[in-house]
Curated annotation (Swiss-Prot):
One of its GO terms (molecular function) is ATP binding. The RuvA-RuvB-RuvC complex processes Holliday junction (HJ) DNA during genetic recombination and DNA repair, while the RuvA-RuvB complex plays an important role in the rescue of blocked DNA replication forks via replication fork reversal (RFR). RuvA specifically binds to HJ cruciform DNA, conferring on it an open structure. The RuvB hexamer acts as an ATP-dependent pump, pulling dsDNA into and through the RuvAB complex. RuvB forms 2 homohexamers on either side of HJ DNA bound by 1 or 2 RuvA tetramers; 4 subunits per hexamer contact DNA at a time. This is Holliday junction branch migration complex subunit RuvB. The gene is ruvB. Has 3 domains, the large (RuvB-L) and small ATPase (RuvB-S) domains and the C-terminal head (RuvB-H) domain. The head domain binds DNA, while the ATPase domains jointly bind ATP, ADP or are empty depending on the state of the subunit in the translocation cycle. During a single DNA translocation step the structure of each domain remains the same, but their relative positions change.
Length: 335
């Protein structure tokens, strides 16, 4: 699959480094997610006053909304060190045991894609999260024995795009569960202006708003689009990102005014033209457009549902009248 400029996943190590350079250090610097921030401010202050570790935190929502950044900010606000890993990287119980025994009092352990932990790994986490202890087995066969090791108080922050895949026992052990929502156009405009300042890029308010409008409610996409539009401003303009230049650049990048690219349009056209608007099953859509089912579920569908272009029903996906209008296709409602 070709790289999508509006993909909400990080595409390479360079982009990871770029995102790291943009990250805020405090909750006051973190733009958006106000409900989540307000609650976390109280929880962090209360834990600090009691000289306790913050309750374990689960952050869930579509990719690119700032779950990793928020984990870093929480650690910073707590004055704690943070150790990061991911579900796929923890393959064996020994991998997790090594990480847990290296923690210092008050540390934050961040596990991205926590829904991809195996059940065997999850079972090691249960006593670690509840009682700050680690049960390990020494030896094999008849001589094997279980030894319990004490762990220092720590905070586990888990991030996932698919909270429904977490087992109930693991999910129930998180004291704080927060859903990150898509960002408003105003919030994304503020993010674009902030990033432009860090990049020393000249941009006016209307130029920033045009980029924000096409960023699918996602800061990661907004920052990526800004970098590409900046290139057009330097090569084809006078170095300043204006509304006119942003529109021209984003049109050339095949990102339409609602943030849809050719893959999104292909998905909607397929539902409308090949399946009479639906309902049609996700596996059928995936096979028709040559995408993985999981890619559609995680990367395309959440935004299309958010803006009202798709409906999800027990019988399958349906393209809405709004989607027809956006694509310039006549909508005939079935009687």
């Amino acid at each position: 699959m070709d790289e999508r400029i509006i993909s909400s996943e990080t595409v390479d190590a360079e982009e990871v480094s770029f995102e790291t350079s943009l990250r805020p250090q405090t909750l006051s610097q973190y733009i958006g997610q106000d409900k989540v921030k307000n609650n976390l401010t109280v929880f962090i202050e209360a834990a600090t006053l009691r000289n306790e570790a913050l309750d374990h935190v689960l952050l869930y929502g579509p990719p690119g909304l700032g779950k990793t950044t928020l984990a870093m900010v929480i650690a910073s606000e707590m004055g704690s060190q943070i150790k990061t890993t991911s579900g796929p990287a923890i393959e064996r119980p020994g991998d997790l045991a090594t990480i847990l025994t290296s923690l210092e009092p008050g540390d934050v352990l961040f596990i991205d894609e926590i829904h991809r932990l195996s059940r065997a790994i999850e079972e090691i986490l249960y006593p670690a999260m509840e009682d700050y202890c680690l049960d390990i087995v020494i030896g094999t066969g008849p001589t094997a024995r279980s030894v319990r090791l004490d762990l220092p108080p720590f905070t586990l922050i888990g991030a996932t795009t698919r909270a429904g895949l977490l087992s109930a026992p693991l999910r129930d052990r998180f004291g704080v569960i927060d859903h990150l929502e898509f960002y408003t156009e105003e919030q994304l405009t503020e993010i674009v202006l902030r990033t432009a300042g860090i990049l020393d890029t000249k941009i006016d308010d209307l130029g920033a708003r045009e980029i924000a409008r096409r960023s699918r409610g996602t800061p990661r996409i907004a920052n990526r689009l800004l970098k590409r539009v900046r290139d057009f401003a330097q090569v084809r303009g006078n170095g300043t990102v204006t509304e006119k230049l942003a529109k021209e650049a984003l049109t050339l990048l095949q990102v339409d005014p609602r943030g849809l690219d050719t893959i999104d349009q292909k998905l909607l056209h397929t539902i409308i033209q090949s399946f009479r608007g639906g309902p049609v099953g996700l596996d059928t859509i995936a096979a028709s457009i040559g995408e993985e089912r999981e890619t559609i579920e995680d990367m395309q569908e959440p935004y299309l549902l958010q803006i009202g272009f798709l409906q999800r029903t027990p019988r399958g996906r349906i393209a809405t009248e709004t989607a027809y209008n956006h694509l310039g296709i006549s909508y005939e409602k079935e009687v």
